[in-house]
Amino acid sequence: MNLIQQLEAEQIAKFKESKSIPDFRPGDTLRVGVKVVEGERTRVQAYEGVCIARANKGMGSSFTVRKISFGEGVERVFPLYSPNVESIEVVRKGVVRRAKLYYLRGRRGKSARIAERRDNKPAAEAQEA
């Protein structure tokens, strides 16, 4: 591991101590709390939509969230380790078979829906106990 990778790993570890990043994948519906500066005051704005892409590049990791706002598709790329991202909450898990869901850009209505993923792991653990 070279020096840059080592520094990057230390920064990621320091960031994870202060904030927790949930395990999410493309297809999941996320609610991202973003710090917005308006004049002198800052507030947290919720941005809720479907994660359509995730790029894991160390400190440069990012994810793209797409939502429909007033009938218009809006996409926003968030840096995963940004101080402006206050919180990430997984609202719903989705079943998809692709890593990048760019095909959703051309779809409207029912064809753009994503089925919900049901994890059977917690139920299996409950039966063993």
Swiss-Prot record:
GO molecular function, one term: structural constituent of ribosome
Record has Aminoacyl-tRNA synthetase as a keyword: no
Record-level GO BP terms: translation
SUPFAM superfamilies: Translation proteins SH3-like domain
Pfam family, one: Ribosomal_L19
GO cellular component, one term: cytosolic large ribosomal subunit
Matching InterPro entries: Ribosomal_bL19, Ribosomal_bL19_CS, Ribosomal_bL19_sf, Translation_prot_SH3-like_sf
NCBIfam families named in the record: rplS_bact
Identification of the protein by name: Large ribosomal subunit protein bL19
Organism: Rhizorhabdus wittichii (strain DSM 6014 / CCUG 31198 / JCM 15750 / NBRC 105917 / EY 4224 / RW1) (Sphingomonas wittichii)
